[in-house]
Amino acid sequence: MDVNASRALANVYDLPDDFFPQIDDLVRDAKDALEPYWKAETIKKHVLIATHFVDLIEDFWQTTQGMSQIADALRAVIPPTTVPVPEGFLITHSEAEEIPLNDLFSNQEERIVNFQPDYPITARIHTHLRVYTKLNEQALDKARRLLWWHYNCLLWGEATVTNYISRLRTWLSTPEKYRGKDAPTIEAITRPIQVAQGGRNQTKGTRKPRGLEPRRRKVKTTVVYGRRRSKSRGRRSSPSQRAGSPLPRNRGNQTRSPSPRE
């Protein structure tokens, strides 16, 4: 991956959350883009990585949805006087990256005890589910952005997606009064190329030669005693036949003058 593509991929993480499709729509679109490559058994970088994220997101998303549904169901059995655990006692995404997965539960349980030692068991389970659901959603958001990048590189080409991310970032960072009303789209970048190719196919066989067309040569005329004669059609006239000179005598009727030697 070149420097520009690597920078564009890093900028994907800074794009707004609502820019990307929802998980269900994203996975469906990615599968549609990957299906021809799966049938052809193509081994490409973007195909392999996008396939990995499709499988990961599908499994992770179903697990996260199940955890969220269980957490919502537990709210009904939590004592109404129970105070929710504050955010300061919940493991964040950055902290979870430093904690081993096996120690994640015990670390969060210790924080709950520090907040309230006799915290109800149902509320504890609900708190754990809240933490794990949030961590999964943040991990899914990162995977969702990476999946969008890789399957769009298959659809449009890596160079086109890189150019599009650069334009979109420029548009987002420009103050509103100095930028266009609508954000750039990836289709608008490829449209001029498609139009040019279509026009080239339509005019095939009738293409005009390059350069300027030769001008038609104007026929110059000379006036000889009121008559117009074309220089290009007739034989070049002798100096005695120029305009204003008398016509030469006819050689057939001309009589030779006697020579003084005779």
Swiss-Prot record:
Pfam families: Hepatitis_core. InterPro entries: Hepatitis_core (IPR002006), Viral_capsid_core_dom_sf_HBV (IPR036459). Residues 205-236 have a biased composition (Basic residues). A motif (Bipartite nuclear localization signal) lies at residues 215-233. One of its GO terms (molecular function) is DNA binding. Self assembles to form an icosahedral capsid. Most capsid appear to be large particles with an icosahedral symmetry of T=4 and consist of 240 copies of capsid protein, though a fraction forms smaller T=3 particles consisting of 180 capsid proteins. Entering capsid are transported along microtubules to the nucleus. Phosphorylation of the capsid is thought to induce exposure of nuclear localization signal in the C-terminal portion of the capsid protein that allows binding to the nuclear pore complex via the importin (karyopherin-) alpha and beta. This is Capsid protein. It comes from Heron hepatitis B virus. The lineage of its organism: Viruses, Riboviria, Pararnavirae, Artverviricota, Revtraviricetes. The gene is C.
